[in-house]
Amino acid sequence: MKAVLIMGSTFDEPHAKKITDKLDDYGISWEQHAASAHKQPLKVLEILKNNESEKDLVYITIAGRSNALSGFVAANSEFPTIG
């Protein structure tokens, strides 16, 4: 199992740290990215493309305000998205 965290911005780091600490506790591998669905949609799509060959994967999105990131990731990936 692998978790890919995508934050809307680096300002979301403190919240992401809480999540990655728990993933570490459970022995789940993870990677973390900062990419805005509004300002960097191509970067988000690149992250999704780079992980499309994974077998067991979940996306965890962290974004404030409109939270377009969760919907954008869910709409462009076959893997579950938690946002």
PLM feature segments, named:
Residues 28-54:
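N-terminal beta-loop-helix "entrance" segment that forms/cooperates
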